[in-house]
Amino acid sequence: MKVVAVTGYKPFELGIFKNDHPGVECIKKALRRKLTVFVEEGLEWVIISGQLGVELWAAEVVFEIQVEYPNLKLAVFTPFLEQEENWKEDNREYYEFILSQADHIDSITKRKYESPEQFKLKNQFFIEKSDALLAVYDEEKSGSPKYIVEAAKKKGEIENYHSYFILFSDLQDIMEEEQWNNAE
């Protein structure tokens, strides 16, 4: 596996409204564990669309992993131009920081937002250009990742394409592990 697409929930879908929320570190730890294993098995690129939440947190994790594995690269393929234009200023600054550190940036449709079709094109692009999908996603709470997860599963039925999931139960295990470690 050379290229993995990473996605997951937007912050509000998780009840997270600031990047210093304890849940963010928990999600990043889960992503770090999975991505480190993938890198040790030959992963070269992580691709994201730059969506707030899991995707940008994954970008931060990639930057951390790059210290030990400098050959790992991050690509941001936005579904449309200027996706951040209606975001709050602090979110825009955070997004621009991530873009400034990315190894590759491009827009899939090369135009500003016009219709939801651009999100469908983004999902198709990500599934076509990656060898696997890593999603912070639990079918019990579908949310925004639902459509790309469905596309990945469909591709997996006809080709050698894998989907890896970080479930709410995985995050709960990490939180309990942290509480246990902090109690010692």
Curated annotation (Swiss-Prot):
SUPFAM superfamilies associated with the record: MCP/YpsA-like (SSF102405)
Domain of life of the native organism: Bacteria
A Pfam family the protein falls into: YpsA
Similarity remark: Belongs to the UPF0398 family.
Designated name of the protein: UPF0398 protein BcerKBAB4_1482
Species per Swiss-Prot/TrEMBL record: Bacillus mycoides (strain KBAB4) (Bacillus weihenstephanensis)
